[in-house]
Each structure stands twice: as C-alpha cells, then as structure tokens.
C-alpha cells in the first residue's frame, strides 16, 4: 500500500498514522503518533504525539509533546521537545529547547536551552553563553561565535561534566573534563581535568586541578 502525502497550507490537523511526505506551511496539529519519510515545517506545528521520520526540516516553529526522532534533522527555525531528540545527523542552527539530544553527529550553531545532556559520536558546538549539564562523545569541538574584534568578550558555554575521547575547545567553563586527548584554548576555565594522552593547554592558569593518568 502506497503511503499518503499530506500538505497543510492553512489550518488543519493530521491523524495518527504512517505517511510519505508531510509538508506544513500553515498551522497544524497532530492527533497521535506519526511516522513519515519526510517532514518539512515552514509554518507552525503542535505535535501531540511522537514524530519519527527519515528527514525532518524545520524553518518555522514546532513543538513536540513526546520524543522526536529523525535520521537527518535540520533546524533553522524554532523547536521545542518536551523530552528527547534522537537523530542520525543533526544540524541545529535555530532555537532548540529539549532535555536530551542523542545522535551520531550533532552540530549546534544556534540557541539551545533546557538541555541536560547531549550524547553523540561527534559533537560540534559554535555557541556563546549556554548551559548544558553533560556532554558525552568520541569527538567534541567547541568554537566561540565569530564577533569581529569583540569576540573575546563573549560569555562562553558552561558544562558540569564532559566525557570524551578527544576535545578541541576555544573557550568554555567546565567543572569536570575527562578525556584522552585535549586541545584547550586560552578562554577555557576548568575545575578538574583528567586526561591520559596528549594535551595542548593554553589556559593552565585557569585549570584548578590537572590529573594525567
């Protein structure tokens, strides 16, 4: 049986079910769990069930009362998820509010709030002042946003705990960092650093405790 395409350009709702392509340029509400090959949101979506798709693109606004799962996720608009985002490849350039992000590769260049934890193979962050409780990954890169001659005054992202294989960070505040290899720029402040491999540290006077194991 062929899957149905759904397009909402005015105001409407989508019932529980399996779909091929879902396009929303108006105002839409889902009335249950939906699965789809593609979900594209340039309007407004209120999902009252879980959403699972091979590809999700949000350039408008979307709120999800349950988990949202996508093979490929691209956000240039606004997304609010009550619990968890699961993705293969996630590029978050808009505004995202959620508790947990899980993925293979997660890139955040926008605004992220309410996030307790990011778990991924790779994490790439290009953000300013943000608080995230925990990062867990093989590879982590943290870049400060470009801001001309004044980028040094940017408030850096803050983390309670980072656990990874290797990390390269231009600037951050972290209570506990455990890794194998690290490359830490001069705008990093760390309370406790534990590493077992190679360390390039430009901010030694801003690290309270260093433990090479």
Regions from the language model: what does each represent?
Residues 1-213:
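Extended beta-solenoid/beta-helix repeat architectures
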